[in-house]
């Protein structure tokens, strides 16, 4: 038997700390939306050390499902190999009451099945990571290369220019711009430094 806990969300953005108390429960949160709004819904559970494997769905004013997510792979959470948390983006099609439904994938529940829900406007952003995180440039060797990976958040599609920040004299690279569909850039670094040069940041 499924039971429901329903709550009206008065204003957005909102963060809700909740719990699936009993097996088979669904928590439902209702909010008023406007046509054309770009919204993000995110459920954190495993990242908070909860045993919950969340499942998320969003229904519109007519009750039809508009978005669904079980497992969302978060590239920024490298230590987690089981991406069990949920995330969905949605452009609202019309004015009216929308509902966010949350449960456990295998319908588990209990005191330890806590979660954190975020409902907010999309906040496009990005984070960069380099591989390797450090590099040895041998004197007079001509340089080396690094790969720069971008993690885009909340629908970010802006072009991202990538280059070295304030390199010392004798070190240079040609800037590269990541388009909205690219996730990695390779920087070729030229080096013309003496062998006695100490370590420095790029």
Identify the meaning behind each predicted range.
Residues 81-86, 181-187:
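Aromatic sugar-binding surface patches on proteins
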Residues 90-95, 107, 179-181, 190-197:
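Short, surface-exposed loop/turn segments at beta-strand-coil junctions that are enriched for proline
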Residues 9-114, 118-173, 201-202:
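Acidic, Ser/Thr/Pro-rich low-complexity intrinsically disordered segments
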Residues 2-9:
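Blade/loop signatures of beta-propeller domains
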Residues 115, 187-189:
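One face of beta-strands
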Residues 168-184:
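Low-complexity "stalk/linker" and mucin-like segments enriched in Ser/Thr/Pro/Ala/Gly
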């Amino acid at each position: 038997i499924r039971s429901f806990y329903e709550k009206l969300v008065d204003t957005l953005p909102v963060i809700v700390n909740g719990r699936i108390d009993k097996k088979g429960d669904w928590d439902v949160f209702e909010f008023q939306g406007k046509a054309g709004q770009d919204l993000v819904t995110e459920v954190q559970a495993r990242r908070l050390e909860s045993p919950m494997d969340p499942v998320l769905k969003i229904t519109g004013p007519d009750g039809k499902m508009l978005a669904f997510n079980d497992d969302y792979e978060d590239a920024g959470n490298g230590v987690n190999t089981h991406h069990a948390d949920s995330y969905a983006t949605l452009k609202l099609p019309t004015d009216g009451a929308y509902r966010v439904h949350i449960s456990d994938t295998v319908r588990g529940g209990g005191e330890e099945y806590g979660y954190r829900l975020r409902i907010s406007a999309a906040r496009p952003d990005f984070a960069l990571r380099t591989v390797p995180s450090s590099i040895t440039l041998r004197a007079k060797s001509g340089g080396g290369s690094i790969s720069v990976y971008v993690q885009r958040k909340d629908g970010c599609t802006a072009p991202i220019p990538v280059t070295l920040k304030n390199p010392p004299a004798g070190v240079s690279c040609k800037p590269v711009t990541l388009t909205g569909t690219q996730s990695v850039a390779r920087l070729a670094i030229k080096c013309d430094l003496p062998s006695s040069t100490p370590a420095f940041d790029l």
